[in-house]
Amino acid sequence: MEYTVSYLLVLFLIGAIGSILSGMVGIGGSVIKYPMLLYIPPLLGFVAFTAQEVAAISAVQVFFSTLAALVVFKKGGYVSFRLVGYMGTAIVIGSFIGGYGSKFLADETINFVYAILASIAAILMFFPKPKGSEEVSAEQLAFNRLYAVVLSFIVGVASGIVGAAGAFIIVPIMLVILKVPTRIAIGSSVAITFISSIGATVGKIMGGHMLLVPSIVMVIASLLAAPIGAKLSQKINTKVLEYILLVLIVATVIKIWYEMLT
């Protein structure tokens, strides 16, 4: 595949825009960048990527964008490592089980499981958050460990079944059910997504679907843009962050149901 300067610029902008948004609201970015990579290049007259190539590029990009954003959130004190330990471990174990078990399920069942879970995440975002929860620090954070482990395990299984990240589902669970402050939920979600992206990145590289040049461009964009999104996240009003997250989740849910029903 031949890469012109304009093509590489388009890829860089896709990576930068997606990384800023994902850094702001604590999702890995594949939810945003996957459709952008799949549809924008051919719309502009460039050669289209295959779904496998897009998934591979997204996996590598998510790894580096979450790593870059995590550094910023950690400095700001918005990462609860206890929360990350419980939920990160459960979601990784769940994703392995879901990934293996998916071969026993029909495609329709796989899509339905994820559509239902994503819809629940969207509904959760409409629930009011408890007052005063934003004042708790990451060190003082108390949460129901059983709920954290069980719910993140379920998300991990569903994510593994579908082969997609579950960060956009984890954040609403943290906000509404575990009552985690918005900025800590976002920072901790970035850490969890980073952990869960390691396996996906290694798998895609070993699978031979990696395109070196686009991946490098997207990684550079991520390393530059994700910290910007993370810094913006610490300055923007938490309500605005929740609205941005809500829009992204609802758009994802609509896309999932549309693809399943058409």
Predicted segments, located by residue:
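Juxtamembrane transmembrane-helix boundary motif
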Residues: 1-23, 32-45, 52, 68-158, ...
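Hydrophobic, membrane-facing alpha-helical anchors
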Residues: 6, 10-14, 59-69, 165-171, ...
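Transmembrane helix boundary and interhelical junction motifs in multipass membrane proteins
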Residues: 25-34, 163-173
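Short hydrophobic/aromatic, small-residue-rich stretches within specific transmembrane helices
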Residues: 58-62, 189-193, 214-219
